[in-house]
Design a protein with these regions (language model features):
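Extracytoplasmic and endomembrane cell-envelope/extracellular-matrix remodeling and assembly machinery
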Residues: 50, 185-188
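Generic C-terminal helix-cap and adjacent flexible tail
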Residues: 190-200
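Histidine-anchored nucleotide/phosphate-binding helix
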Residues: 88-89
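Thiol/selenol-based redox catalytic cores and closely related redox-interacting motifs
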Residues: 7-11, 15-37, 110-186, 199-201
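Residue-level recognition of beta-strand->loop/alpha-helix junctions
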Residues: 105-107
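Anion (oxyanion) recognition and catalysis
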Residues: 95
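Short active-site neighborhood of thiol/selenol oxidoreductases, capturing the structured segment around
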Residues: 64-85, 100-103
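Extracytoplasmic c-type cytochrome modules immediately beyond a signal peptide or single-pass transmembrane anchor
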Residues: 1-63, 70
Length: 201
């Protein structure tokens, strides 16, 4: 149920829609409480996104940063994306400030591509953190295959609504599409004063 009599919520992964009680009408859009000025759809989606990410588990991510972080960012990244490489250069500033960065491999061009194969190779490397740094700097990664979660990362990206890389998910479920420098990310996380970026959804 929703706060509107006769309107019910439907959930598809991390996506939210609304349907009339008789099942005749479906509404795709934002449900906003004008009294409190809260976007109820965004709040619900944030919880669903976090649930989906938690279900994947950190064992299926490439994790950088402190074991006991102040805040956490989950980043859908493409190993051949220039803006992802720029963000990766900012990661040391984030981790030094107590932010854990968790990478999910999201080859935008699809699964029958060199980028996909490089993503798998990064995952299969003995040192994944080192390998992703090499890949993002344009270096050669030893091409290996092994059991890997890359397809699951892509599926989760579709569920979250990733349209490009990098896509950053904050630990409150807000989604930030595109590159942002460390200072803006730290401000958005409440760890530093400065210009705050507004999440898209």
């Amino acid at each position: 149920p929703t706060p509107i009599p006769g309107l019910y919520e439907m959930v598809f992964g991390a996506r939210v829609a609304y349907v009339s009680a008789d099942g005749q009408y479906m509404l795709m859009g934002e449900l906003i409480d004008l009294d409190s000025r809260r976007n109820l759809t965004t709040m619900r989606r944030a919880g669903l996104i976090l649930k989906s990410i938690d279900a994947l588990g950190e064992a299926n991510m490439i994790v950088l940063g402190p074991a006991k972080p102040k805040r956490t960012l989950t980043v859908f990244t493409d190993v051949d994306c220039p803006y992802c490489a720029r963000l990766h250069q900012e990661v040391p500033k984030l981790t030094q400030a107590g932010v854990k960065v968790r990478y999910l491999l999201y080859p935008r061009a699809g699964n029958d591509t060199e980028t996909y194969r490089r993503s798998v190779a990064v995952w299969c490397a003995k040192d994944r953190v080192k390998a992703i740094g090499v890949a993002k700097s344009g270096g050669k990664v030893e091409m290996k295959t092994c059991a890997n979660p890359v397809d699951e990362h892509v599926r989760l990206g579709h569920e979250v609504g990733v349209e490009g890389t990098p896509t950053i998910v904050m630990d409150d479920g807000r989604v930030l599409p595109g590159y942002a420098p460390a200072a803006e990310l730290l401000a958005a996380l409440g760890l530093q004063d400065g210009k705050k970026i507004e999440p898209a959804r």
